[in-house]
Amino acid sequence: MLSKNVANGGLTASPFLLALTLSLGAAVSLGITRFAYGLLLPPMRADLGWTYTLAGSMNTSNALGYFVGALMTPWLMRRLNAASVMVIGALLASLFMGLSGFFTDSTMLLVQRWLAGVASAWVFITGGVLATRLGALDPSRSGLLIGLYYGGSGIGITLSALLVPTLLNQLGAAQKWHGYANWAWAWWALALLCVIASLVLIAPARAMRPLMTTSTSRESHHRQFRIADFGFALAGYTMFGVGYIGYMTFVIALLREQGASANQIMIFYALLGVACMASFRVWAGLLDRHKSGRALATLNVLLGVATILPALTSAWPVVLLSGIVFGGVFLSVVASTTALIRHNLSAHDWPAGISAFTVVFAAGQIIGPMIVGWIADSAAPVAGASDADGLARGLIFSAMALWLGALFASRQKALQQAP
């Protein structure tokens, strides 16, 4: 059974429990550090007088940091170990989140978002490596364990949804508390959540250190990682990065422009997070069955549908459906690439494979927010166009990027294993 304690690789704890606690790394690195900014974008833009292009560039800067962090992670893991890098990254991400509340200068905020991106890449990649190692202990349920880790981002999303709108509403948009705007206090509250989660991560990180020295000779029949072998999947994942981040950055701003109340936004974002947490159960079988790019392609198609819905209508049931489907799919796309690597590579090459996919993922995220922000701003000079019209056009672009990614991923074949 998955719930029983196992001794494989020196572990004495339940793989399920370890994956669950490791999921707090995904909560910190993506659920809060990356995605909570979408909740803070509207009040920060209103208070600081930003354009949508500048607002989008904050997540572009975060993605640039993530890109650099992804390049650094294999080097760090060779000198430390995945578990230590994860905890250090989580604590640093918490620090940089907190510092964001002290600045109003856009340059300084861009720097803080960049630093948080570097640290969050360390956390997310190393957590993915550890979750993949756990999956190797129970191959029949590896998709479940990997999906559980990535679904942890939903914990961060849900907590952010419950915390940020409530705090902003309590403090008021026009008033400052002890000299700081309401959004600054929201940054500090989110940083506190990250600190708590980071401290909880210490125990599972210690428990999993034996896995990082486990022999992988039994998997020597797998091929080594080569970029050319995964070209279509890497292209598909790049377009996923371009498309999904536009939604996560600007959908709250679109809902605000469409007249959604603070309570409606809280419900929408919380349901998105809950769906994300539940998604590991829904897609585990798909990830386990397919060794090709089929899972990545299927999930990108569904994600494109969820992304385009709020751009086509502001009907509340449809908007809620969009959030639930998006939350139930988007991090399973990430898990699908990890599963693809596990199916086709030896454990020795998992870190290299995960890092390569993370790099192209980050590259896509660098492009996405600025393009969507530019599209939203470019609608302003058009007669009769509103901010909502511009943001809707941006989400249509995001959906198209996701569908293009699905087309690429559908061409990815499973690798022929070495004898």
Predicted regions span which residues?
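Paired small-residue
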Residues: 96, 107-115, 317-325
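Helix-loop-helix hairpin linking two adjacent transmembrane segments in secondary transporters
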Residues: 106-108, 141-206
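Cytoplasmic helix-loop-helix junction between adjacent transmembrane helices
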Residues: 112-152
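Structural signature of the two symmetry-related core transmembrane helices
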Residues: 84-98, 294-309
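Helix-to-loop junctions at the C-terminal end of transmembrane segments
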Residues: 69-81, 279-291, 376-377
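Helix-breaking motifs and short loop linkers at transmembrane-helix boundaries and internal kinks
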Residues: 49, 81, 102-108, 291, ...
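Extracytoplasmic gate region of multi-pass secondary transporters
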Residues: 37-38, 229-270, 274-277
